[in-house]
């Protein structure tokens, strides 16, 4: 995905977590800033009418917490996420991508990362790349291993809808449990619509995003595979 105007409040939340902004930083996927889309007026009216009708209904029911802002802070008036991070005082910001030739590191995240990259970074950021990688387990494990202990992982990924956007849309439980079981402590967790409305739960709207930031507390030797908790609860009640 990319940095969008309506998502800026969530970025500011995460950037203000103590210890999050620390060199060196790796961004998985070269991320441009898209603060305006070129679409036809008819499509725009149709899209906005549907969105705002949906939002009004859900806000009345208390499911929508806030309305997104439209002002772009000075620090975010850049062309890429890398440049934005430098405005926050970071100096060693690198990008990893398989297709975009602007990236500093070219890697296929379906494959294990090089040993030389393990434990190198203090912050690893993925805003919408995980869902495009076929091998989710390997990709997550790579992201985990790129980090130093006490480093921060920032994930932004679809958790409802987004049909035909990427290979996957993830259950929040899948991502949260995978992160926690592999040595991380979640420090930030929110859900939003594609246009930045904060949600109580991702099943409220057709397309929803999970925002997660977690601190790496320990190094695991092997990936710990999560199990879906609801089935354990169901069978436990049947005993």
PLM features: what roles do these ranges have?
Residues 160, 166-192:
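Conserved Class I S-adenosyl-L-methionine
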């Amino acid at each position: 995905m990319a940095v969008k105007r309506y998502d800026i409040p969530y970025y500011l939340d995460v950037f203000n977590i103590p210890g999050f902004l620390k060199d060196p930083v790796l961004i998985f996927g070269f991320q441009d800033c898209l603060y305006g889309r070129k679409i036809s007026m008819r499509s725009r009216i149709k899209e906005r009418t549907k969105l705002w009708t949906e939002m009004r209904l859900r806000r009345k029911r208390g499911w929508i917490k806030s309305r997104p802002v439209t002002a772009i802070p000075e620090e975010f008036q850049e062309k890429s996420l890398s440049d934005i991070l430098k405005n926050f005082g970071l100096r060693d910001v690198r990008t990893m991508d398989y297709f975009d030739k602007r990236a500093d590191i070219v890697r296929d995240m379906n494959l294990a990362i090089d040993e030389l990259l393990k434990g190198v970074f203090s912050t690893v950021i993925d805003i919408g790349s995980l869902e495009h990688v076929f091998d989710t387990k390997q990709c997550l494990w790579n992201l985990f291993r790129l980090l130093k202990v006490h480093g921060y992982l920032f994930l932004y990924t679809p958790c409802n809808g987004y049909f035909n956007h990427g290979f996957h849309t993830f259950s929040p439980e899948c991502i949260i449990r995978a992160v926690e079981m592999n040595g991380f402590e979640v420090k930030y967790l929110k859900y939003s619509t594609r246009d930045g409305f904060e949600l109580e739960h991702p099943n409220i709207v057709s397309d929803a995003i999970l925002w997660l930031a977690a601190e790496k507390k320990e190094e695991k030797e092997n990936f710990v595979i999560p199990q879906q908790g609801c089935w354990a609860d169901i069978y436990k009640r049947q005993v």
